[in-house]
Curated annotation (Swiss-Prot):
Disulfide linkage: none
Binding site residues for S-adenosyl-L-methionine: D211
The keyword Transferase appears for this protein: yes
Gene Ontology BP term (one): methylation
Organism: Mentha piperita (Peppermint)
Protein's name in the database: Flavonoid 7-O-methyltransferase 1A
Length: 344
């Protein structure tokens, strides 16, 4: 190996050694609401001003911002002409940091550090035993989810953030898929946030949010959304279209086939369809700019769910065909997930 190649390899190895720091510091910036502060100011902010806003040491905030600017999260800029702090360092938003505000993916980033213990990481034990580290009984719930702050705030906000971003992409890039659709069932729709966004964007839809009885019992009324309790392994309310958003990646292939069969029973054979919104991994690992995130999500599912996984085109085709659908189409919606249309 040439000296230059060896030096690059060593640098890359060091970067992996400190790889966890990037996510940790991004999470810290979100906790301090730095992206929101910069967004609200609408102009570059000096380190002293930022330190005052977040009630932290200016030196420490500078070092954090220097690190994040190196990684392209924020950008260092020149002082604005009207500045009275000529010697201060200024930082501004980037397209990435705008995606880290509270109204974007900020809440999802806040989830990450909390899931490292006991069962949020892929470890040697995970790979050898197919069990989550720190969880003794497969039927035992993760103690993390028993924490009301985590389950009712951190986890719920993260899932809502993810669903909000993906639903916005569906509305923007898959609007034609809802033309001529009268009724739509959102299976596993929780409290109906995603469905309410779709009904607002496509007001001709009659939305049915279908989830476990104990979930829909806690849901607040939403315009254009009817809540129905039940289990997707038994039966699903009939509609023109059945939607599964972030559902099938939680389950084994066998369970997915059973869920899809129930979905198939709920739609018309002539005009109905099932919409699956989940990640589709490219066979050769290339793909688009979201491939790294999809692969990351897949190994996260391996750590947090016993049978959860993201699937390739071939793997999706296998379970869709086995469930009895005659054809399916995969559509790119310019985000982490794709839309898969399955026709009975």
């Amino acid at each position: 190996m040439a000296p230059e190649e060896d030096s690059l390899a060593l640098a890359e190895a060091w970067n992996h050694g400190f790889g966890f720091i990037k996510t940790s510091i991004v999470k810290t910036a979100v906790e301090l609401e730095i992206p929101d502060i910069l967004e609200s100011r609408g102009a570059p902010v000096s380190i002293p001003e930022l330190a005052t806003a977040v009630d932290c040491s200016a030196d420490r905030i500078y070092r954090v911002m220097r690190f994040l600017a190196y990684h392209g999260i924020f950008k260092r800029t020149k002082p604005p002409p009207e500045s009275t702090e000529g010697g201060s360092v200024y930082y501004a938003q980037t397209p990435v940091s705008r995606r880290l505000t509270r109204e974007n993916l900020g809440p999802f980033v806040l989830l990450q550090g909390t899931m490292r213990e006991p069962s949020g990481c892929v470890t040697a034990e995970t790979l050898r035993t197919s069990k989550r580290p720190g969880v003794v009984n497969e039927n035992e719930s993760d103690h993390l989810y028993e924490d009301p702050v985590f389950s009712m705030k951190v986890f719920r906000d993260a899932m809502a953030s993810h669903a909000r971003m993906t639903t916005a992409a569906v509305i923007e890039n898959y609007g034609e898929g809802f033309q001529g659709v009268g009724s739509l069932v959102d299976v596993g729709g929780s409290y109906g946030m995603a469905l309410s966004m779709l009904v607002k964007a496509f007001p001709w839809l009659r939305g049915i949010c279908f989830d476990l009885p104990e979930v829909v019992a806690r849901a607040s009324p939403l315009k254009g959304v009817e809540f129905v309790g039940g289990t997707m392994f038994e039966s699903i309310p009939k509609a023109d279209v059945v939607m599964l958003m972030f559902v099938l990646h939680n389950w084994s292939d066998e369970e997915c086939v059973e869920i899809l069969k129930r979905c198939k029973d709920a739609v018309s054979k002539d005009k109905g369809k099932v919409i699956i919104i989940d990640a589709v991994i490219d066979e050769d690992g290339d793909g688009d700019e979201f491939t790294g995130a999809r692969l990351g999500l897949d190994v996260t599912m391996m750590a947090t769910m016993f049978e959860g996984r993201e699937r390739t085109y071939v793997e999706w085709a296998r379970i869709i065909n086995e469930a009895g659908f005659r054809r399916h189409v995969v559509k790119n919606i310019k985000t982490l997930e794709s839309v898969i249309e399955a026709y009975p």
